């Protein structure tokens, strides 16, 4: 088994919990051509579409908080998939992360990106939470956690984050928590940020960094996807805080695989998705204009193709 350096695969369980879920209903990834932007577009039209896509797809932070991303090595663990599908998922997630310049952990890293396929996600999450009461971190009690557990969607995501120095140094705050469910929002712990030479009107003293993420797939709701579509979708929502309830406009994106439209969804992550991720990880997180810089960077990447 040729595993990527960061890869960890578990087909049996997580934290002592048994998993008996399979992905037998998912077809394998077919050989499909890459999705590219081929229709001629005027630059201004492309800019408008890119701005809509980036500003809608990326979850806007509260107040003066930075955008959320992985600033420390990500280490995925996959559970609930057959071995072949699990190995494919880990390899593909590694490829997505590398191409977007996401830091990756070593072969012996401790898992912090949990990808779980479950037949009954709500029941599994309740059992896992009971087994590990510190699994979710939130300042305002258990309400955000319950929303995350109880709200049904094909793929749900929970991010635990830490506040770090603007140079990605020492952790300054306890864990934060945010989920993609309606009303989940960012729930933060109070953090003291004293005077710093890093802070200014255009730069932040501290930034938010994902410390762990939980991606839970409802097997019954993804049966129409092939394994490639599913893993690419997981890669995007697991590496960036995506707003799953916003309309991203006309952009061709893997985020539309669950949209109820007559237009066939992309067979894999598109160049728009790749540009979005790359722009998130190549623009300065401390800069208060990062979202605008992401729009510019994404436009340049797409226009160059």
Task: Describe the residue ranges of each PLM region.
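Acidic/histidine-rich, surface-exposed loop or edge segments in extracytoplasmic proteins
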Residues: 34-35, 66-81
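N-terminal secretory signal peptides that target proteins for export/translocation
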Residues: 1-11
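Long, folded non-catalytic interaction modules
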Residues: 47, 77-92, 101-305
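Boundary at the C-terminal end of the N-terminal hydrophobic targeting segment
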Residues: 28-31
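Bacterial N-terminal signal peptides
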Residues: 15-25
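N-terminal post-signal-peptidase region of extra-cytosolic proteins
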Residues: 53-62, 95-102, 200
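Compositionally biased P/S/T/G-rich terminal and signal peptide-adjacent segments
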Residues: 44-70
């Amino acid at each position: 088994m040729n595993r990527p350096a960061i890869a960890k695969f578990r087909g049996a369980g997580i934290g002592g919990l048994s998993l008996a879920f399979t992905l037998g209903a998912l077809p394998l990834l077919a050989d499909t051509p890459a999705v590219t932007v081929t229709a001629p577009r005027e630059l201004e039209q492309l800019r408008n579409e890119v701005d809509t896509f980036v500003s809608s797809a990326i979850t806007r932070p509260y107040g003066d908080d930075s955008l959320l991303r992985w600033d420390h090595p990500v280490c995925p663990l996959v559970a609930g998939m057959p071995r072949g599908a699990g190995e494919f998922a880990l390899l593909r997630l590694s490829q997505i992360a590398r191409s977007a310049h996401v830091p990756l952990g070593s072969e012996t890293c401790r898992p912090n990106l949990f990808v779980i396929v479950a037949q009954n996600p709500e029941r599994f999450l309740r059992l896992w939470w009971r087994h590990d009461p510190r699994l979710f971190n939130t300042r305002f009690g258990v309400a955000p956690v319950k929303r995350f557990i109880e709200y049904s969607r094909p793929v749900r995501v929970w991010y635990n984050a830490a506040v770090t120095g603007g140079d990605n140094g020492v952790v300054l705050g306890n864990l934060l928590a945010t989920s993609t469910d309606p009303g989940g929002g960012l729930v933060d712990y109070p953090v003291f940020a004293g005077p710093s030479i890093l802070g200014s009107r255009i730069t932040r003293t501290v930034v938010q960094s994902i410390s762990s993420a939980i991606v839970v797939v409802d097997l019954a709701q993804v049966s129409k996807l092939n394994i490639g579509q599913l893993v690419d979708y997981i890669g995007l929502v697991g590496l960036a805080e995506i707003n799953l309830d916003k309309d991203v406009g006309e952009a061709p994106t893997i985020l539309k695989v669950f949209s109820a439209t007559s237009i066939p969804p992309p067979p894999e992550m598109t160049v728009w998705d790749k540009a979005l991720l790359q722009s998130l990880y190549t623009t300065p997180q401390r800069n208060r204009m990062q979202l605008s810089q992401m729009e510019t960077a994404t436009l340049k990447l797409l226009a160059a193709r």
